[in-house]
Amino acid sequence: MEKSQAKDPDRIDHIEVRGARVHNLKNVNVDIPLGELVGVAGVSGSGKSSLALGVLYAEGSRRYLEALSTYTRRRISQAGKAAVDDVRYVPAALALHQRPAVPGVRSTFGTSSELLNSLRLLFSRVGSHVCPHCGAHVPPSLNVAAELPLVCPACGQKFRGPGAEELAFNSGGACPTCGGTGVARTVNRAALVPDESKSIDEGAVVVWGSLMWDLMKQVCGAMGVRTNVPFCELTPEERAIVFDGPAEKRHILYKAKKGDNFAELDFTYFNAVRTVENSLVKAKDEKGLKRVAKFLVEGPCPDCGGTRLSAAARGPLVRGINLAEATQMTLDEACAWMAGVPEGLPAEMRPMAASICESFQSTARRLLELGLGYLSLDRAGSTLSTGERQRVQLARSVRNRTTGVLYVMDEPSIGLHPANVDGLLGVMRDLIADGNSVVMVDHDTRILAAADHLVEMGPAAGAGGGTVVAQGGVDEVAACPESLIGPYLSGKKRVEARPRTAADDMFDLGRIHLESSGLHTVRPLCADVPKGRLVAVTGVSGSGKTTLVLETLVPALAAAAAGEPLPAHVMALDAAGVSRVNLVDATPIGTNVRSTVATYCGVLDDLRRAYARTDAAREAGYKAGDFSYNTGRLRCPICDGTGQISLDVQFLPDVDIDCPDCRASRYGAAAAGVRRAEKGADGLGLSLPELMALSVDEALPHVADLKRAREKLQTLHDLGLGYLTLGEATPALSGGEAQRLKLASEMGRGQADAVFVFDEPTIGLHPRDVETLLGVFQRLVDQGATVVVVEHDLDFIANADWVIDMGPGGGEAGGRVVACGTPEQVAACPQSVTGRYLG
């Protein structure tokens, strides 16, 4: 970036980091320019996020919060001080995390982007309101804004117009039937009697058995229903009693399950539908809800039609439509509609309407620049992809027009098609133009090439990383011989990691054929997935990739494998030979520090048994269970096996420190005395706490004589996870690391009956890591598996056997299969947006 003015020697133009030791950082000293776009690159586990989030963001946010009063700080969750000697000149910091939290059931695109605030205000202030006395519409006026009553021209009655909060489905405007969720759960009658060849006595009405209402069989017989004939032979009248019979008392003779005792009981009849409804009301925990859920089906609320709004909230009209109809529009459509609102109002109302509309348009402008114009305002927040949620978060930050803030972004290119990269860079440039600084952790070479300054961490992952390999301008880093990202930035190197299947041989192993009706933005379509191949599903944001794969293909395959009915929108599925579908996502593994790499992959069980067989363990009476740091006798009594203790410092955030007694090993002193003889080693080897402190690669030689443990660790090494420590807590792993760890149990076994589905597995991966990942997928394919990947990474797509490209645009402009074939065939298709970047 060119500087138009001479540099002021007294002006602070960089952040100074000295002695950073967060996670695997090795006393890193680095200067980060202020007022510039700074990219942080490096292989997975090299320390990128540790530097950006663990040091820069942690210190920037902590120091800002320290300026607040102690009373205020007590009410704010605070991060502890980073493990760093000194950080100077760091501004107040905001972080846009790699994976924003999945919103709750009440969140929509409109609420999370705050667009609905302006829209509700518009309908409240300038809408034509409904008279509650006669139902007539009252022409728009300034009375609502002036807090004056409205006068109905039809009946002359006065009433108060609704405020913006009374039009919100999260408060006063919620539909009373569904509570503002838009969804109603009804009993699925087909699930109540899945096998009509059985009689009621044989358990045809499964709900009476599984929900502990076995007596209902006898009561049903007392109601006049034949219980000893197949259900399919019952008359319509008998079926009506089973499903909808009245709650009448009947006298029955009940035989105890044990013994020959009989008892006479007067029992009220609960028909099959009421049994489910009653159990749903009484369900107090997740287990109870799960037991009932299989008899329920979710659908749009019958009263509000899925709009979430009450009848009163749907009353006000603007330009002839109500609030529910306005939220059903896409953002593109809503902006065009909003532009015409002021001119249709009386002259005295136009300035107020123009102000509200401008507020809406300014919020929408950033979202449109980030390629989200295809989303409807009522789109459920939980159905948004990770990339969509992150871009909504980014748009909110930019809209605030702050200055002097350090924005730290973790993988801002998540979910972003190459066609949307320019919009993202434009937003980051706007932040800098407002006087802010941006530090972004990313792997996309197009994003990194646009940075003013690059910092590359490495050279390897874990203990082999944590140092600054190269830094400077893009050209400087590209020319640095030590840089691993340099050859990819300069175009001298491309990702090529696997042999691809020839087009003529693509369907030699069979195919999965899928036909579906419309869902969300996806139109009716049919698609063929070649079995035993690596398949990439591509397309711009909102083109329907997630809907096709995660909401159609995966549930359809799961239902077929379980022998259950296909989802309602799936018209046909031919997946002969497929009995398993594995969705491998990047959600964190476990929620607390007790879950570690060793426990998740199962190697700790093998190690505990091995140490329990030693002479020292036998003499002390230790069993395998005693070597568990969760429940065993050998766990540290001070930290209870967590490896950490929390210090309560009043007015300051709790400080988690390594347990001083076990030094974070999780084991008590006695465990260190149990050592195991190792193959080819003189004397005794390591204790279990010492072994757990090693990386996977370091531990492999120490378990050479333990076949099961060795194979599990070798698999982790082959997955590119050899740098992980056995005792490392799994919630701290990155999304890519979590995905590969979940695959560990699947490697090395036949997979011809399996389909593996991945949603953007290259998130956070350096081009070298992408090569490793492609090698992992090739192993699955070699074992017979079909691997389906939703992906934007062009290097990955170019290495796929088959590409299904959705589009051509997002939202209403997409939703169909534009092209399918080999990467070369898709690149040759003029309608394919992805193809333009593959060519």
Whereabouts are the PLM-identified features?
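Conserved phosphate-binding elements of NTP-dependent enzyme cores
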Residues: 1-839
